């Protein structure tokens, strides 16, 4: 079997940090620890050679604890975790100081902020402070994971254009709705997470023209 690199590994230990979104409706089954031993058991027959941890939107006060949690896992030789993308908010005051503390931690590969949430308005990632924060990631040789509403992929294009020295990972193929892409469900302009097939295709094509953008 071909060795697999799992580039989007979610783990959490609720005794070490809090995930506010676990209180949302519909995620009751996730309200428990998901630890490395659980992952190893589940993936035992998948030939996973390496993994990259993906941040889990912890409470802001727990971001450092999350980074410490995954750094320790990366240091150990009893699991395949080789690197981590941690939580952070490039547009916030203090982001530069926060992320700078990891510049000599070779396990920390980059940052993600979940952007498809109600309190993040369209166009947010084009704010000057956000752009500067993402540009600084490039200076540190770190990447930024893009995880936003599919109808706002044009904003991602605008951000990428302003950050030529930063590499980007576009998560979940831009969060497209496969039912819309397949033509089974129409675009609903009143739904903030809806999109049209043509808009998604056009924006994905534009993002694909940038060498510093990788899609997964």
Predicted regions and their residues:
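Active-site beta-loop-alpha junctions enriched in small/polar residues
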Residues: 10, 56-57, 86-91, 113-117, ...
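Active-site mouth loops of central-metabolism enzymes
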Residues: 23-31, 55-60, 85-91, 117-125, ...
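Structural motif corresponding to alpha-helix initiation and N-cap regions
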Residues: 33-36, 64-67, 92-96, 127, ...
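Catalytic pocket-lining loop regions of alpha/beta-barrel enzymes
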Residues: 123-216
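An N-terminally biased module of ancient metal coordination in phosphate/nucleic-acid-related enzymes
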Residues: 1-71
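Acidic (Asp/Glu)-rich catalytic clusters
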Residues: 39-47, 68-80, 97-109, 126-139, ...
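Structural preference for beta-strand elements that scaffold enzyme active sites
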Residues: 3-6, 49-52, 81-85, 108-112, ...
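Short aromatic-enriched loop/helix-cap "lid" or pocket-rim segments at secondary-structure transitions
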Residues: 14-20, 66, 96-98, 123-124, ...
